Amino acid sequence: MKQRGVGVAFLLIAFALSAGGCDVIEKFKQKAKDKADKAASAEPSGPLSSDPDEALGLKLNGPIECINNASGQVSRSRDRYVSWFPDAKAGPTGKEKIVYGLYKVTPTFVERCKKELAGYRKVKEPPTADLDKLADTYEAKLDAVVPLIETAAKYYEAKDYEDDKLAKAKTMHPGLMKAFDEFNDADKALRAELKKLKSGMADRELAKVEKTEGKKLRWNHLKTNMVAEKVVQMGDEDPSKLDAAAFETLLKEYEAQVDA
């Protein structure tokens, strides 16, 4: 039996080395790859956990990945862009002494975001209808702004503005700013809905801990984190629109919670 096995193995190797054998091997390799790709993309459509809040939290990871990375890339590019001319609405004047251009968006962050959103859409439970719509809008606005950033970045990197006296820059500006602003609106809306969903989860978890353990160490830890997150979120708001009295009240609540 051993000699027969060696003989069969030899024949298989000889076949694999032939032209026909190579074709068959390639077909098997491609078939295996296709099967692996299909398995990798087969995210579950049902809840990701038997615990409702845990299932929701896991589902939200997709959109959160986008705002943590892709959004930051677009925001960074916009900030750089509007930093070197006096009026963001009017755009480049042609009189600027220094032209910085704008930062490109790293493709991997965009690709990862889109992959995460694709996985998010496959998970139907728990239902998140409002978030679904906002995520669709977010992705559409991301797809709209990224190519415009890329085109503008290439123009500035090549220093074409030195040849045309920023003529193309002035032409590009309205469309670029419109795309930036629309993406920013979509990003804010997505963040607000995520904040609402996460806040509800935190409130339910706090109530659950209070019921089972009382207002002890774990409850205080959760409560402190909740208040701290609210402080950070309010602190990130536009200073001109910040409710100073409400922020002061929140800070006092945080201090009291830390001392509890």
Where are the predicted features?
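Leu/Val/Ala/Ile-rich N-terminal alpha-helices, chiefly Sec-type signal peptides and the beginnings
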Residues: 36, 40-181
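C-terminal motif of bacterial Sec signal peptides marking the signal peptidase cleavage site
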Residues: 18-21
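Extended amphipathic alpha-helical interaction segments
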Residues: 169-260
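Bacterial N-terminal signal peptides that target proteins for export
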Residues: 1-9
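Bacterial signal peptide processing site
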Residues: 23-26
